[in-house]
């Protein structure tokens, strides 16, 4: 089996830093690339990223703002928001060697092109071997070494297996699959549905309503996934159902907290949630393929200003009675 002893994490935000810590804990030689010299200086001087306060990082992590140097690792983890992936990949392109594994750690669909994240990689970095890491995980939990399980997908099963062994440890448990599209869909779609869950929580509709909404959201996720070629077991697994449950039930999720602010009629948090960017393109795809997604469509319409939050709730509650499925 191929081993990946050196790993570079491209992106020194909370999630990138957490993954760097997990990889270092797994015994890999880790380089963490970031553009903010202040963040890198804090990590180098104090062993702590200001975006993960109170969490001590592994001393072996090396930080750098030299992208060319970072690209020399055996495997790369690309940890940037979906709408910035193309720009990051273009910057990486001159420096990445042929057949380098590129593990994308983003959840979304590119606006304008409707491309999933590995499709962007195939277009911009055709010399790499793309993979995707996704699942129910918060940066602080992973950084602290709390038990977390995720899914790692690559089209080549030997690559997926090798990466699983390279990144995995007693605290971070990756499960491998070749269903790349299924993992991409789970991560992208649940972000939009989590906004709906946050709205329900913000409107104080009750635990019963939140449970019903999450369940019906899963039905939408499954419909969309199967229509787009995902495997049923992937959508019902960690990167689908698992991630949906986590982000529909925790204020640690930016999508959930964004929805809560909408439900309360408050100004949304400053940081952009992936679901905000994904919602309109998700509905474009759903409409083009005649996939019924009333919850996701209500979210997209609220975000577009076409309807109010209350109107969206009323529309969902006024839908015709039907058989479950």
UniProtKB/Swiss-Prot annotation:
Residues that bind sn-glycerol 3-phosphate: 107, 135, 137, 190, 243, 253-255
Subcellular location: Cytoplasm
Catalytic activity: sn-glycerol 3-phosphate + NAD(+) = dihydroxyacetone phosphate + NADH + H(+); sn-glycerol 3-phosphate + NADP(+) = dihydroxyacetone phosphate + NADPH + H(+)
InterPro entries: 6-PGluconate_DH-like_C_sf, 6PGD_dom2, G3P_DH_NAD-dep, G3P_DH_NAD-dep_C, G3P_DH_NAD-dep_N, NAD(P)-bd_dom_sf
Active site residues according to the UniProt entry: 190
Keywords noted in UniProt: Cytoplasm, Lipid biosynthesis, Lipid metabolism, NAD, NADP, Nucleotide-binding, Oxidoreductase, Phospholipid biosynthesis, Phospholipid metabolism
Annotated metabolic or biological route of this protein: Membrane lipid metabolism; glycerophospholipid metabolism
Domain of life of the organism encoding this protein: Bacteria
SUPFAM superfamilies xrefs: 6-phosphogluconate dehydrogenase C-terminal domain-like, NAD(P)-binding Rossmann-fold domains
UniProt cross-references to Gene3D superfamilies, sorted A to Z: N-(1-d-carboxylethyl)-l-norvaline Dehydrogenase, domain 2, NAD(P)-binding Rossmann-like Domain
E.C. no: 1.1.1.94
Alphabetized GO MF terms: glycerol-3-phosphate dehydrogenase [NAD(P)+] activity; NAD binding
Gene Ontology CC terms: cytosol
UniProt: NADPH binding residues: 15, 35, 107, 139, 254, 272, 274
Biological process terms in GO annotation: carbohydrate metabolic process; glycerol-3-phosphate biosynthetic process; glycerol-3-phosphate catabolic process; glycerophospholipid metabolic process; phospholipid biosynthetic process
HAMAP family, alphabetized: NAD_Glyc3P_dehydrog
Family to which this protein belongs: Belongs to the NAD-dependent glycerol-3-phosphate dehydrogenase family.
Role noted for this protein: Catalyzes the reduction of the glycolytic intermediate dihydroxyacetone phosphate (DHAP) to sn-glycerol 3-phosphate (G3P), the key precursor for phospholipid synthesis.
Protein name (record): Glycerol-3-phosphate dehydrogenase [NAD(P)+]
């Amino acid at each position: 089996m191929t081993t990946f002893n050196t790993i570079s994490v491209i992106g020194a935000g909370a999630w990138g830093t957490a993954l760097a810590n997990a990889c270092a804990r797994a015994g890999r030689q880790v380089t963490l690339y970031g553009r903010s010299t202040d963040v890198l200086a804090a990590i180098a001087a104090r062993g702590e990223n200001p975006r993960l306060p109170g969490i001590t990082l592994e001393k072996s992590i090396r930080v750098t703002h030299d992208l060319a140097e970072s690209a020399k690792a055996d495997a790369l983890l690309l940890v940037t928001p979906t709408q910035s992936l193309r720009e990051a990949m273009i910057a990486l392109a001159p420096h990445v060697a042929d057949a380098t594994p590129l593990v994308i750690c983003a959840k979304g669909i590119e606006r304008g092109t409707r491309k999933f994240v590995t499709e962007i990689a195939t277009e911009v970095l055709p010399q790499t071997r793309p993979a995707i890491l996704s699942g129910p995980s918060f940066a602080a939990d992973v950084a602290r070494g709390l038990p977390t399980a995720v899914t790692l997908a690559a089209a080549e099963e030997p690559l997926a297996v090798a990466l699983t062994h390279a990144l995995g440890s007693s605290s971070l448990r990756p499960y491998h699959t070749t269903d790349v599209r299924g993992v991409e869909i789970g991560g992208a779609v649940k972000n939009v549905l989590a906004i709906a869950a946050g709205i329900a929580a913000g409107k104080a509709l009750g635990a019963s309503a939140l449970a019903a909404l999450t369940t019906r959201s899963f039905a939408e996720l499954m419909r969309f996934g199967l229509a787009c070629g995902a495997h049923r077991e992937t959508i019902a697994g960690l990167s689908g159902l698992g991630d949906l449950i986590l982000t529909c039930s925790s204020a640690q999720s930016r999508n959930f907290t964004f929805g809560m602010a909408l439900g309360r009629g408050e100004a949304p948090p400053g940081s952009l949630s992936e679901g905000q960017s994904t919602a309109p393109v998700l509905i474009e795809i759903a409409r083009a393929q005649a996939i019924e997604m009333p919850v996701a469509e209500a979210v997209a319409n609220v975000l577009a200003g076409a309807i109010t939050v209350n109107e969206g709730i009323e529309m969902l509650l006024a839908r015709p009675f039907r058989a479950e499925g």
